[in-house]
Amino acid sequence: PYYHVVFTVPEELNSIIYSNQKLLYDALYHAASATLNELAKDAKYLGANIGYICILHTWGSAMNYHPHIHTIVLGGGLDDENKWKETGGKFFLPYGVISKVFRGKYLDELKSLWNDSKLKFHGTAEKYQNSYRFKELLDKCYEKNWVTYCKETFNGAQSVINYLGKYTHRIAISN
């Protein structure tokens, strides 16, 4: 089986992400990948190296700015001896754990970029140039529950190809 996992950041970060699209879209990919890899390798969840595909979306269903990562996760992986390890037919990572680990990894990368003075602040993000305001924003984001959507959606390679084609080869408003 294949699983569909969506990693979303709180809307409070949208203005900073919009001002730093390359850096913070990369951070989305890094945090999502690191979360999946770390948790899948943990023996209490799967104890294997998994395969997945990540797709960045920058808009939501209401045509609003809504950066998030869709992932297609293979239902199993290779253990340390390169033997296939099944997930047992259900998604193998707890949703709450995925959300908390992803939140930590994304905000850690955001803090590192801030500390290295790599972030730019335009428009409504200008207020976060102030270190106090930036820390307030981070605190607010750490306090929020980040929701990660997970479900089994795909049966077979053709379903995955159809899904990817639908979302990777269109714009926000299409026929």
Model regions: which residues?
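Beta->alpha loop/short-helix hinge microenvironment recognizer with preference
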Residues: P1-N175
